[in-house]
Amino acid sequence: MDAKIKPLRAGKSADARTDFQPAELDPSEFLAAAVQPDQPRPSRAEAEAAVKTLLSYIGENTEREGLLDTPRRVVEAYDELFQGYHQCPAEVLDRTFGETAGYDDFVLVRDISFTSHCEHHVMPFYGKAHIAYTPVERVVGLSKLARLVEIFARRLQTQEHLTAQIAAAIDEVLKPRGVAVMIEAEHTCMSVRGIGKQGASTFTSRYTGMFRDNPAEQARFMSMIRNRG
């Protein structure tokens, strides 16, 4: 059975705080592209040279046939894996639809698969994100929530930060009655290095508005995630 690591919830013990409020994120951190077009960056040649240096550091012969094109390939892979730095999360959520026909419950999109990289070891972590929000008059296209996850995932992250950024972006742009985000993921920095424990899953969650204030809504959100019937 997979190990499950879950955050402590307020109210789980007599000593748990019930007045805790999560720290606010700076909107400039999650609403705009992280890299601006005029921002100074190393050249591609410098990036490839850095890869070559790392290969030499581990003891490889960078002139052997199998590694001649590796620096170029690694830089090209980084361009793809970290393209989220050049994309704007707010733009993804900008287009909304007003035809809700009086719908007043939350919208849930679950099992959004993603792969990201931890900022500590630059190693992959991967899993699924589950997102719910309760709209006020307008809704966003469902694919946009998956796209939002993809943008933030394609940056160096911690799972906690990724969870908070997704919730904060939806909260800031859509102004819903509440947002709930849960992420479950496996971290290769834990499974293939260090302690080497494969199959361990990490769970993180973030609630705002009605979800934060109403434990019954949190429970319903969790139930709908787990109910596969």
Swiss-Prot record:
Location of region: Disordered: 1-21
GO molecular function, one term: GTP cyclohydrolase I activity
Pathway note: Cofactor biosynthesis; 7,8-dihydroneopterin triphosphate biosynthesis; 7,8-dihydroneopterin triphosphate from GTP: step 1/1
A Pfam entry, by short name: GTP_cyclohydroI
GO biological process, one term: one-carbon metabolic process
Keywords assigned by UniProt, alphabetized: GTP-binding, Hydrolase, Metal-binding, Nucleotide-binding, One-carbon metabolism, Zinc
Entry EC number(s): 3.5.4.16
Ranges in coiled-coil conformation: none
Ligand binding (Zn(2+)): 118, 121, 189
Family matches, as SUPFAM superfamilies: Tetrahydrobiopterin biosynthesis enzymes-like
Reactions accelerated catalytically: GTP + H2O = 7,8-dihydroneopterin 3'-triphosphate + formate + H(+)
Cellular component per GO, a single term: cytoplasm
Family: Belongs to the GTP cyclohydrolase I family.
Subunit structure, interactors included: Toroid-shaped homodecamer, composed of two pentamers of five dimers.
UniProt protein name: GTP cyclohydrolase 1
Organism: Rhodopseudomonas palustris (strain HaA2)
Lineage: Bacteria, Pseudomonadati, Pseudomonadota, Alphaproteobacteria, Hyphomicrobiales
Name of encoding gene: folE
